[in-house]
Amino acid sequence: MTPIVSLEGRTIVVTGAGQGIGKALVETVIELGGNAVAVDLNAETRGTVVAAQPADQVLAVQGSVSDSALANRAVAEAVARFGAVHGLVNNAGIIRPAMIEKMTDQQWQDVIDVHLTGSFYWTRAVGQHMLERVKGGDKSGGSIVNSSSDAGRKGAMGQINYAAAKAGMLAMSMTIAREWGRHNIRANSVCFGVVETPMTEVIRGEKFRDGIMAQIPLGRWSTPQEAVKAVCFLLSDGASYITGQHLGVNGGFHISL
């Protein structure tokens, strides 16, 4: 029987691969038989992740996701190394929290550049390659997964920049699905709740912990390892008829008032 989730022979580009969800994604993609292109700004954390994986299944790329030229070069390197790119996970993220009236132009722009503009650059670069493959007769298409958040659906106090960017990523997934669906290129979003990563340390701290936990029916945070299972499913042929969707992986947080 064919496994529901397999990435055997697939090459997946993962941005923000140095820690948290991205690190777990690289590990799981390789565990499922795929190749991972690990993209991260931090050379040290990215290097640690890559060093722990089989050298013939991973390609390291250092730089900012908001650099469009880097996206183009990385895709070209991945194709030269592995033959093709079959999937993309736009996972890189930062937070610059502040209430609306106190948020600076730079705080706003930093978050938009990484989450929204960066996701567009990498989607365009990977999508151009996928479309070329389709023109060449390869009908396998591809899968793009945007790492969004419940903040994009419900808003987030003190994070209008983050919430707006994540909402934009939801719209991006639906637009990709509409434009490229006829080429068998799928696009979906995963809306994470609170995952145990370095980026969520503040909201998992004593000041906010009890209030947020009370809104999660399962009563616990997600681990990166369980969070990425949904992403890998959407990348796989098990999700071959799923596109334009927003999948909540949040312990039920989205149904809380």
PLM features: residue spans?
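C-terminal helical subdomain
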Residues: 189, 210-238, 242, 249-251
